[in-house]
Amino acid sequence: YIMYGGKVIWLIDQVFADMDSLNSKYNNNTILATAKDLNLDDQFFRYGVRFNKDLVLDLRSAPIPVVNGKYGTQVKTQLYPWPYFPFLFSKNDHPINKNLDVVKAEFAGSIDLIGSGEVKKTVLLASSDATKVMKAPTRISLNMLSFEPPVQQYNKSDIPIVVLVEGEFESVYKNR
């Protein structure tokens, strides 16, 4: 399909992390985010992209509600910024993302643009200028919300999260 000019949207999730598991009282609000082997690395490498087995954390992120007490019979919740839900920004005027506002991602991974000069690659959405990348496996805990984030560790910027790849693609099975 791709070799004959078909158009495909790939939504790749290289790391398993889940808020449902994180909210469980049985695991002390902690999970281990682990890498998934989707067996697609060769194909995407040939197309000029690498989906990294990591998580992008950003100080500019969406808040999550956290239960932090009770008021009588009412549960009291408060919103805390959750670095694992980064806001993504567009830095270009491509027709796909022109006039697009900030986009919220959940447990997003980074993408590297590599070699393969035959195809055109455009970063559609990227992280902010206050970003940190954590390789999988990594521990994720709601307890981190109790502390002020170490701002000096969020020293990366514009990490590609959404990429458009255009052109003519060769089969990953060619010459095999």
Language-model segments: which ranges?
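Acidic, S/T/G-rich, low-cysteine, solvent-exposed domains in lumenal/extracellular/periplasmic regions
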Residues: 1-176
